[in-house]
Every structure is written in structure tokens, then in C-alpha cells.
Amino acid sequence: MVKQVFAAFPQGSAAGPEKFRGQAAMAGRRARWDLAITGGQPPLRPLRPPVLYRAPLPRTKLEASVPDGQVTGMLEIDGRTVAVSGWRGTVGHNWGSEHADSWVWLHAADFGAAPEAWLDLVLARIRVGPARSPWTAMGALSLAGDRIVLGGLGRRLRVDARPGRLTADVPSPRARLQLSVTTDDGDPVAVPYTDPRGGSRTVRHAALASVELIVRRPGDRALTLSSSRGAYEYGTRRDMPGIVPQPLPEG
């Protein structure tokens, strides 16, 4: 995964929601990509109730334009070309005036017992004056075409979120989700995110996280799912001991 920040998109580049084309250079290495993504599912707007998209808080809004899609095209890394055909992928973006104080973004697919399933979940704490809010969860789990809304305002959850791992118990109207996430120390990258209001956040992103889920729904037996193809992002305004963020790549 490559994250870039531009005052304007370079000539010839494209950035979604259906087409991605660009290049980046960092630490003597170069990458180029030309990718298309298609998906038959409606976008996911996880903030609930929907009035939050018009409210002053939270100051970051987000959407998964393509919560689950198929990616085709090509990647080129240091001159080596990789053909991409039928890869699972997702497209999302966020906007606003201030990053959350701390957050987790988790996306997972290719669960062995339910290969069509996908999970897209955001956990966040925001700052209101001098205080920090409790963790709030918002997102969805898709099972057999049924999109189960997760979390929401006022729902108490248990969260232990760290740069390299996560455990959480997320209640929702139709299900309760227990999840754990672990990442390999050699997989992630860490970068700084500049905050529109000043300062920055340190963000650690792992693109090959292991995800374990237990889904409990009224009247059904508990369903256990696992995937080794999760994307786990942890961001915070606090320092991460032993983690030094690297500058974002040049276009």
C-alpha cells in the first residue's frame, strides 16, 4: 500500500473510485501502478446515525466507496512487473478538519469459512476540549450478502488497541462481534499524518494482519471466522515507543 499527499494530483495520475494510476519513490526504490477496481455493492458510510455526516463532530468523516471489489491491472516495483487479476480490494477515503485523537481502521476479507464475507470497521477516540471520548465503533460485517451494522453512538464496547495488535468486543443491534488482530513486526510501515489544525499523528499500517472473529447473533450458533488478509491501521497523536515514522513517498 502506498499513501501519498499532494497539493494537486500529478499529471497523468488517477485516484479512484474506479481507477488508480500513479508512481512513487522512496529510499532508493520506485513503484508504479495502473489499477482498476469494480464492485457490485453499495458504498458503506459507517458513521451512525447518518446525521453525523452533517454535524460538527466528529471532525473526520469517512466512506468506503467500494467496500469489496475486484482489482485488475499491473504493479511495477523496481522494474519488476506484477500482473493483477481478480485480487480482492477496497476503496475508501476520509475528509474533514481534524484527525481523531486515536483510531483504528480494520478491513478484512477472504475468511476461510465464509469466503465472500468482508469486514470494515473503524474505532476512534476524539478530543472534545481537554477530554478524550471513550472508544466508539462504527462499520459493517457482510455475511452471505447480509450487511450487519456494527457499533454506533452510545454502545459500550471493550477495546485494547495497540500499534501491533487489537482485541475488541463490539455490540450492535443485530450481533455482537469479538475480534482479535495481530501483525508481524516485519510487515508494517509507519508514516506521519499532518493534521489540518496543526501538529501530526503517527500512523502504523500493516497490510497482512491476521484477524480472528467470533460473531454472535440472536437465535444462531456462534460463528468463528479467520483471515490472514487483513489491513490494520493504528493512528495516534502520542509517540509509539520504538517506532519512527518515515516521510511519505515522493510522486
Enumerate the predicted regions with their spans:
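Structured soluble/peripheral alpha/beta segments that form catalytic or ligand/cofactor-binding pockets
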Residues: 1-251
